[in-house]
């Protein structure tokens, strides 16, 4: 997995460049999010636009990132969920925990509204 970092309007964007977020690479995402929030990041967007499959390990990595955000008084949002990934969020009801946006642009705009 390749994780691209960009920044736009004060929002750190992590673009996950992989078709799967699973047990093979979820620790990488978990560690990256932990490092960002420990370093003082307050606004983080994870763009899942290329991810076609997510398992419980991938969901766990994102939940861990969410907890790190809350602990650091920050905010973690998600964007670009493909249908199978969105279905997993709905099945686990994590769509009620995370702020999920269709596009990165909408997610970035949501940070300005708060």
Language-model-derived ranges and their functions:
Residues 1-15:
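Short beta-strand/loop segment at the start of cytosolic alpha/beta domains
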Residues 4-6, 79, 101:
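General small-molecule cofactor/ligand-binding pocket signal
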Residues 8-10, 83, 105:
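Residues that form or immediately flank small-molecule/cofactor binding pockets and catalytic motifs
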Residues 12-14, 19, 99:
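Structural signal for short hydrophobic segments within the conserved structured cores
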Residues 17, 49, 105:
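Conserved catalytic submotifs in the C-terminal HATPase_c
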């Amino acid at each position: 997995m390749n994780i691209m970092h960009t920044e736009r309007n004060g929002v750190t964007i992590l673009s996950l460049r992989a078709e799967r977020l699973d047990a093979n690479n979820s620790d990488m995402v978990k560690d990256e999010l932990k490092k960002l929030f420990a370093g003082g990041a307050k606004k983080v967007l994870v763009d899942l636009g290329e991810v076609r499959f997510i398992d419980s390990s991938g969901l766990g990595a994102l939940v861990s990132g969410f907890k790190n955000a809350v602990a650091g008084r920050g905010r973690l949002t998600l964007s670009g969920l493909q249908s199978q990934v969105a279905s997993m969020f709905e099945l686990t009801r994590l769509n009620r925990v995370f702020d999920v946006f269709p596009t990165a642009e909408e997610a970035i705009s949501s940070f300005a509204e708060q």
